[in-house]
Amino acid sequence: MLDRNKNIYKYLLPNLLDVQRASYCWFLEKGFVQELRTFSVIRDYLGDLELNFATKFYTINPPRYTLEEAKRKDATYSVRIFIRAQLNYLEGADPQEKQVFLGDIPLMTDSGTFLVNGIERIIINQIVRSPGIYYKSEADKQGVRIYTASLISNRGTWVKFEIDKDDLVYIKIDKAKKFSIFVFLKALGLDNQEIFNSIENINYFRKTSNTDEQLTTEQCLLEVHSHLKPEEPATAKGCQKLLYAKFFDSKKYDLGYVGRHKLNQALMLDIDSDVRILTSLDLIGIINQLIRFRFMPIVSDDIDHLGNRRIRSVGELMANQIRIGLNRLERVVRERMAICEHSYLRVNTLVNPKPLAASIREFFGSNPLSQFMDQTNPLAELTHKRRISVLGPGGIARDRAGFVVRDIHPSQYGRICPVETPEGPNAGLIGSLSTYGKINAYGFIETPFYKVKQGKVLKDLPPIYLDAIAEEQYKLAAGDVATDEHGVLKQPDVPVRYQQNIVTVSKNEVDYIAVSPIQVVSLATSLIPFLEHDDANRALMGSNMQRQSVPLLYADAPLVGTGLESQTARDSGMAILSSNCGKVVTLSDEQIVVQDKNGNQLIYNLTKYKRSNQDTCINQKPCVSLYEKVRVGQLLADGTSTETGELAVGQNILIAYMPWEGYNYEDAFVVNERLLYDDLHTSIHIEKFEIESRQTKLGAEEITRDLPNVNEKSLSKLDENGIIHIGSWVEPGDILVGKLTPKGESDYLPEGKLLRAIFGEKSRDVRNTSLKLHHGVNGRVLDVKIFSRANQDDLSPGTNEVIKVYIAQIRKIQIGDKVAGRHGNKGIISKILPRQDMPYLPDGTPVDILLNPLGVPSRMNVGQIFECLLGLAAEHLNARFKVIPFDEMNGVEASRGFVNNTLMEAAEKQPWVFSTQHPGKMMLTDGQTGEMFDNPITVGRAYVLKLVHLVDDKIHARSTGPYSLVTQQPLGGRAQQGGQRLGEMEVWALEAFGAAYTLQELLTIKSDDMQGRNETLNAIVKGYPIPRPGTPESFKVLLRELQALCLDIAAYKIEDTTLLTEDKEINLMSELNSSRDDQSVANNYLLTRGTTP
C-alpha cells in the first residue's frame, strides 16, 4: 500500500507502448532487409537473365502527407520504399541499373497505431506455438507407451520422430506414412559408420538399423521417395531434389532464428543462428534425446507453457506479409522475363510495385489481427495495443479451442494477466500483457525480479528479466512478501514458486522476488483499488468496463486510485508533456509554444473536438499559463479522460447502499437529478455523415440547393451550394446536403410515362437523393469537409465530390443508461429522483446514487465498500489516496485497519463520519418524510463510470418502414429501422393458448400479406371493418422454391356454389400460374368431389 508520504515501489513501469514500437523499429531496421535478401536474386526459367536487388542500398522516402494532413484527407500515412536493382544479361550485354519503386508501407505513428485510409488501426500481438523440438510420451489403445518428438519449423515441413512399441525409431514427414529413421539418414548421404559413431545408445538403435544396413544410398533415396510421393515414379535424383526443397531450401524451409535458438538450447548444440535449415547434427541430436527420453524419467513438454509459446508482434507479422508480396513479385518478374523480348526489357518495367501493395493492403484490410482501434477512452487504446490473441492465421480456431488452451497456466505469472479477458466465446483466447511484461528478441515474454541474497532484497541493483523457462530453476517470492526498511525479508519462512509449484522455504533460500504486487495483472486490472478483496469474475468485469467508459464533459480523477493513473495518461499520448525546458510564450486553445533559453521555439498542437473511432469526442485543453516556466516532462495539456495528468474516466459520486421502494431491485440504480443538472455524467458524441457526388451513365450528380418539390423551410439551414451551415441545430429528417441524381426513362412509374407521352411534359429528369439526418439523431453541426477533384483531392474513380458532415450531440445521463463502478458492480438507471426526495446525510448533503446492498454479498466484490469509505474520508481530509493492491504484507486485515484509521482521522473534522457503534455506517434521513431511517447505512464516495452502452443508441420503435423484397416482411435491426420478429417460439405460445385469430392476423395482415395489409390500412382510415386476411407472401415464396425443385405444387380452396351441387376447386395462385400449359391445369382440377345425395 502507498501512503501519502512515501512510495515503496521505486521501480518504474516500462513504457506501455514499447511492445508495439520496438517491434516496428525492428521491422524497419532488420526484418524488411532480411526478407529482401531472400529474394535478392531473381533468375528467369532459362537462366539467361538475372535481376539483382542491392539490399544495402534501399531508401525510405518520408511520408507524402503529415499525420494531420493524412487524417484530414482520409489518406494512408505511409513511407515509399525505393531499392537499387540491376538487370544482368548472362550472354554478355551490358547490365542495366536503376533505382526502382517497390511500394508504400504504412508507417507507425508515435502512439503505436497505423493510419489507413484516414482510419486509425492497430495490429494486435499473436501468441503461437514456438518453433523447436517437443517431446511427448502417451499410451496407445493397448496401453503401450509411444515416445514422439515433433520438430516444428517456422515455415515449411513439420517432422515427427517416433519410438513404437517394438523399440524401432521412425520418422514421419508431414502426412506421409512413417518409415525408418536409418533409411532417412542414409538417404541424406550419411554412411553406416558415421551414423553409428554419432548415436549414443548404439545397442538400442541396432534394432532399427539391422534390417536396412545393407541398403545403398540410392536404394534408400528410392524408398524415401516412395513414401513421400507414392503417386510419382521413384528416382534417386528426384528424391534428392525433393529432400532439398523440403529441408535445405531456405525459401521453403525455415526454422527461424527462434527455432534455431530453441533447437540449440534443447539439444545443447552450438550451431550458428544464421543456419536456419536442418543439419545432420540436429537430426542425430533429436534421435539421441528421444532415446534418452525413452529410458529416463523426463517430463513431456507442455505446449501451453509460455516457454513453448511466443509472441508474433507487428514487426514479424508485417515481415511475413512482405514475404508474400515479394513472392508474388518474383512470379510476375519471371513471367515478364519469359514473355518479353530481352532487348525491350527495362528494370522499371520488370519491377511492378502492385503485388507488394496488394499484399500490404490485404493485411491491413482483412487480416483478423489488424483491428479498428478502440478509442473509447485512453485506457481502451492502451489495452488494445497490449492485447494478445491466439486467434488469426497460424493460430487456433475459436471453435476448436478447448478448456486447456483457455485456462490460466502457472508460467503466465507476471507475463499474461489472469484476470483481464473477454466474457463469452473468446474467454481465455484473448488476453492482455501484464504491467511489467516485456517481449524479448525471440518473442518470449519476460518479467522482472529483484535479486535476493541471504534474505535481503537488492533493490539498488537493476531488476533481472527472466523468461518462463529460465525462472523454473529459481525460487521466486511474490511481490507482496513483507520486508523491513533495509529490504530484509521479515518472515523466517517464505512461500515461493519453484518449478510450477508453491513451496515454503527459509528466507535465505529465496533467489529472486517480484518487483511489485501488481506485476501479475494487466494495466486495466491494476487500476482497481482493493483488488484483492474482489472475486476474480467481478474483477474481470471491472477491468473490461473501465475500457467502455465514455469520456465525460468534466473529467474527475479518482479520490482512491492505485498510482498507475498518471503513467496510463502519459503513455496513452492523451496528456501532452513538455520535451524541453523553457517559458510558455504563446498560449491558445489550439497551440502551446515553449521557448528555451537559446531562443528555440517548440510548438505543441492541441486536438480540438475531433471524432474518435467510437464516435466519442477527443479534445485537449492547456494546463499551463502564459509566460509560465516549464521543465522537461511537465504537463502542458490535459486530454480526453485525463485531469492534471491522471486518468479520469468517471466521477467521484456520493453513494449509499440501501433499497429505495424497489427501484434499485436487480442491480438498478436510483440517481439524483444533480447528476443531470450539474452535467456530472454528461458526454459529447460526434457522428459523421457522408455523401458522394458520382459520375453516372446519365450524367453527373449535382450538389445543389435547388431541389424540386421541397419547401423553403426545409432549405433554410442550407447555404447557396446546398450544404448545411456549420453551427446549425438539426433534427431527424433535416436535409444536410442537397443532391440531385439524373434518372432515365426506366425510373418513371407507368402513369408518369403515359402523362409524358400524352402531354409531352418536360419535367426535370432528376431524382432527389439528398442526404438527410436519420432517425434517432439530433445535434449541432460541428464541421463540414468538402473533397473534390477541383481541389486536387484523391477520390475513387467515378467520384466527383465527397462531403462529410460532423454532428455533435450532448448526451446527459438518463433512465436506461448503463453505469458501473470499478469492481464489476454494474447497473441500469431506473429512476431519476428530485434532490429533495433523496436520503440525506447529517450535514444535509443529499446522496447522489442509491445502490442495492444485496448486490454485494453474493458477488463477493467487497473492494467497493473499502473504496467508497476511503473516498468519503478523502473528501473530508481534502486528500487523494493511492492504494496498491495485495497489502497483506502490512499486517492481517491491513485494508480494514487503514480505512478505519483514515475515517477516524476524518471524524476529527466531521464527527458523524465515523461511529464506533457501527463503523463505516451512518444514520440517514428520508428526504420524502423527513424522518430518520431505522438502521444505519453504508455511505461513501465511489468512482462511478458512465459506459458506452447508452440508451439513445439502443432504444428503437417502428410504425412504418422498409420491407424485404423477397419475403415482403419487415427488415430486422435498428440500423435498418426494422421491426420485431414473431419467431417460431412465439407462434407456439399463441398456438398453445388457442389464439387462432390473433395468430392469423400476426402472420398475414400485420406481416407479409401485401394485398391484405393495404386493404386493412384503407379500412382503418375509412372506419370500415377489417377485411379477411389473404395469402402471405412467404407462403408463395415457399411454393416457388418447391416448384424450382420440379415439384408441381399449388394451393387451392373449395368454393361451394350451392349446398347440393358440385363443389369447385379454385387455384389461389392462378394469376401466378398463367404461363403453365392448359393440360397441367386440367389435371389439377380433377380433384373434385361427387354430389351429395
Swiss-Prot record:
One of its GO terms (biological process) is DNA-templated transcription. InterPro entries: DNA-dir_RNA_pol_bsu_ext_1_sf, DNA-dir_RNA_pol_bsu_external_1, DNA-dir_RNA_pol_su2, DNA-dir_RNAP_su2_dom, DNA-dir_RNAP_su2_hyb_sf, RNA_pol_bsu_bac, RNA_pol_bsu_CS, RNA_pol_bsu_protrusion. It catalyses: RNA(n) + a ribonucleoside 5'-triphosphate = RNA(n+1) + diphosphate. It comes from the Eukaryota. It comes from Emiliania huxleyi. GO terms for molecular function: DNA binding; DNA-directed RNA polymerase activity; ribonucleoside binding. The keyword Kinase does not apply. This is DNA-directed RNA polymerase subunit beta. HAMAP family: RNApol_bact_RpoB (MF_01321). Its EC number is 2.7.7.6. The gene is rpoB. Gene3D superfamilies: 2.40.50.100, 2.40.50.150, 3.90.1100.10, DNA-directed RNA polymerase, beta subunit, external 1 domain (2.30.150.10), DNA-directed RNA polymerase, subunit 2, domain 6 (2.40.270.10), RNA polymerase alpha subunit dimerisation domain (3.90.1800.10), RNA polymerase Rpb2, domain 2 (3.90.1110.10). It is found in: Plastid, Chloroplast. In plastids the minimal PEP RNA polymerase catalytic core is composed of four subunits: alpha, beta, beta', and beta''. When a (nuclear-encoded) sigma factor is associated with the core the holoenzyme is formed, which can initiate transcription.
